[in-house]
Amino acid sequence: MGIARHWEGVNANDKGIKIVQAIKDLEQRRWADLRHPLYPDHRSALPCTVCMFHAGTFPSAVPNTAVLRVSLGVMPQEDVKDVERQVTEQISRVAQADPWLRAHPPVLEFKEVGADGAEIPVEHPIVQTLAQAYTEVTGRAPVLSGRTGGADTRYLIKHGHTPTVIFGPGQTAQMHALDEYVPIDNLVVATTALALAIVDWCGLV
């Protein structure tokens, strides 16, 4: 919250920019501190990014409020509540260093997905069965890695006690991108590999 007056006011954008930098600093620290074998490029697993910044109601009016929305990734070994605490402490440190923010502390809300990380061993039979099926179809070994983003597999693994693998066609980099698409040959490969894995796993042959 700021004050919507020009030279004598408090521009919410200026205060919001401090929060943006605080989030960037937290991201850098998490990049330095966290590692996981399924994420060789750990930066892809740990987004800590202000994705939306909304302030003001009119072009010539000093904004007195700013709303920031952040995308925050967690590693499989992390607890979401602990990561939320890290964010809260980081924002609090920045607010304490600014007289206005100290008197008017930012309000934090953690909502939307709030997804825990989840994993199963790469040695698990379901992983190896699907990997073998993929190799039979393509003639090459699959790359076994973690992925970033909310997925329902966490419910099956952590609450349903059901080992689960994410597998499908296309490139992860193309997901949710402009002109998102999946090549037909990728779809054929994925479908065939899944069919072979099901046959093997269920002992149908």
Feature locations, PLM:
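Metal-dependent amide/peptide-bond hydrolase catalytic core
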Residues: M1-V205
